[in-house]
Amino acid sequence: MTDRTAAVTRTTAETDIEVTLDVDGDGDSTIDTGIGFFDHMLDSFSTHGLFDLTVQCDGDLDIDDHHTVEDVAITLGEAFTEALDDKRGIRRFADRKVPLDEAVASVVVDISGRPYFEFDGEFSQASVGGMTSHMAKHFCRSLSMNAGLTLHCGVDGENAHHEIEALFKSLARSLDDATRIDERRSDVASTKGEL
């Protein structure tokens, strides 16, 4: 199997981002976005997806968290696209439901090359530790659009910290499952012959 790794940079007037990704990693991460709670979520994503991940972001946090969260998701999505290349041998589909105390999140993913996003539920508080709660939903949408994922997510609970963390863990576990190589498959998991 070839290395499924990527290194992607994104520089705009709003953010300067460097991301490295190893899909077949051990869950090691080095994250610095300037938003402590977002760093915690990306670290959790790396840990539970067993992705080796580095994210360095210098964003316009003097304005708000929107550009930082969105642009990290865009860059991470591009990294997944690069690392998975032609997607040969991947399982493609996966779903996971993850609890965290009273909260539960679900993610259903298809690494289809056809970006589509649905979200069910609301976050219980407006923000957590410097991150606006609705940006967790926007992160998933931006990741979906830039990694070519059909992604259906949902959350339920009473504590936004728990809801968002369960969401990131569920996303990680789903992507870990969907990106795994099925040794029985030598081609792409599509009747079209490509994804």
Curated annotation (Swiss-Prot):
Reaction equation(s) it catalyzes: D-erythro-1-(imidazol-4-yl)glycerol 3-phosphate = 3-(imidazol-4-yl)-2-oxopropyl phosphate + H2O
Protein EC: 4.2.1.19
A Pfam entry, by short name: IGPD
A Gene Ontology BP annotation from the UniProt entry: L-histidine biosynthetic process
InterPro entries the record matches: IGPD_sf (IPR038494), ImidazoleglycerolP_deHydtase (IPR000807), ImidazoleglycerP_deHydtase_CS (IPR020565), Ribosomal_Su5_D2-typ_SF (IPR020568)
GO cellular component: cytoplasm
Molecular function (Gene Ontology), one example: imidazoleglycerol-phosphate dehydratase activity
Main enzyme class: lyase
Main location: cytoplasm
PANTHER family: IMIDAZOLEGLYCEROL-PHOSPHATE DEHYDRATASE (PTHR23133:SF2), IMIDAZOLEGLYCEROL-PHOSPHATE DEHYDRATASE HIS7 (PTHR23133)
Designated name of the protein: Imidazoleglycerol-phosphate dehydratase
Protein's organism: Haloarcula marismortui (strain ATCC 43049 / DSM 3752 / JCM 8966 / VKM B-1809)
Lineage of the species this protein comes from: Archaea, Methanobacteriati, Methanobacteriota, Stenosarchaea group, Halobacteria
Gene: hisB
